[in-house]
Regions:
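Early extracytoplasmic/lumenal segment of secretory-pathway proteins
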Residues: 53-134
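Extracytoplasmic/luminal low-complexity segments enriched in Pro/Gly and acidic/polar residues
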Residues: 242, 246-250
């Protein structure tokens, strides 16, 4: 017998009964299916409401060794306004749950691998970090950062020349040398001052010192820490990333 026919037969037995008996019959025989259907409806409604309230991520990056403060929202609201982003339906994802620390090899490797994975799927637009963290990211063999000479106009580069972070591309070449000729990262001698390209063999500007941004300092409890920001070479949102760098320089 089909399920629907069984229901019709069962209800025919109680159709002339009082409402109370009908309800008792229904509850005795169909309470489990009814509860299951109710749960499915509740979950479906909850899923629809959650999806409708979820903001679309239109920009993302990593803030390494940073801690979020109550000022973070105000910082990003300022950028949304400058970039024409609708903060009601769109948002930026700034991942500050990552660390890169001197002597913490495993921790650093995990962080770098997470960043590289995000860059590989074009889900990362920028990286911000203190001098040590930024150096570790700059000198990965994957060349994560874009050459700012190809990203920002000459006027901006000239105006902020004393704030540019340079990496020595000759070191990356050594890391990517043929097997047998490679040099271990720990054995390399990195530039002592990333703002002095004249001390490097093949300097490339990949970051900007934005430590003077008071709202950024307050947003992530930086307490005067030197912070560099660089654009990711694989970004799928280059124009928005340019706007972000220019916003930080204002």
């Amino acid at each position: 017998m089909k399920f629907i026919d069984r229901i019709k037969e069962d209800w025919s037995k109680v159709k002339d009964k009082p409402a109370k008996e009908k309800w008792e019959f229904f509850w005795d025989y169909y309470k489990i299916p009814a509860i299951c259907i109710l749960l499915v409806v509740v979950l479906l409604v909850q899923s629809i409401l959650t999806s409708s309230n979820r903001k679309a991520i239109v920009f993302s990056g990593f803030a390494i060794n940073c801690k979020i403060s109550i000022k973070e929202e105000a910082f990003w609201d300022g950028f949304y306004e400058a970039a024409g982003i609708d903060g009601e339906t769109q948002t930026a994802a700034c991942y500050s749950d990552v660390q890169i620390m001197p002597g913490q090899i495993q921790l650093n490797n995990n962080t770098v691998q997470r960043i590289i994975a995000g860059c590989a799927i074009q889900d990362v637009d920028f990286i911000a970090g203190d001098p040590y963290a930024f150096q570790v990211c700059a000198y990965t063999s994957q060349r994560l950062f874009v050459d700012l000479r190809e990203f920002l106009d000459e006027e901006t580069l000239a105006k902020y020349a004393d704030r540019l972070y340079y990496m020595d591309n000759a070191i990356i070449d050594m890391l990517n040398a043929p097997v047998g000729e490679q040099v271990e990262p720990n054995a390399l001698e990195y530039p002592k001052d990333p703002k002095k390209p004249e001390t490097m063999k093949n300097p490339i500007p990949v970051g900007i010192d934005v430590s003077d941004r008071e709202d950024l300092q307050k947003a992530y409890y930086l307490d005067g820490t030197t912070i560099y920001v660089g654009a990711i070479k694989s970004t799928a949102r280059p124009e928005l990333t340019k706007q972000f760098l220019n916003y930080l320089l204002k």
